[in-house]
Amino acid sequence: MPPPPRLSPDELAAALHGLPLWSGDGDGLRRTVQLPTFRDAVAAIVAIADVAEEMDHHPDIDLRWRTLHLALVTHSAGGVTENDLDLARRIDALLPG
């Protein structure tokens, strides 16, 4: 099955208005979130992993003590697609703002 199409710059800019905790460009979406404790950060990774497995769309996650750096991109499309936006919304539902 081919990947969904890469979003145009205008589509991405419009989508980012609805995702105020995320930044991004055609190369990917990014969000940094600080959790209260290291254990909370690890638990957040597990929750994100569950959603990612369900969606079969996997983020890049970097953990630094209690801070998560998240990056989303659809590599097979060469940029941001609706899959990335959907995953960003699902992550936002899991993590504090």
Label every PLM stretch briefly.
Residues 1-68, 72-97:
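Long, contiguous binding/interaction regions
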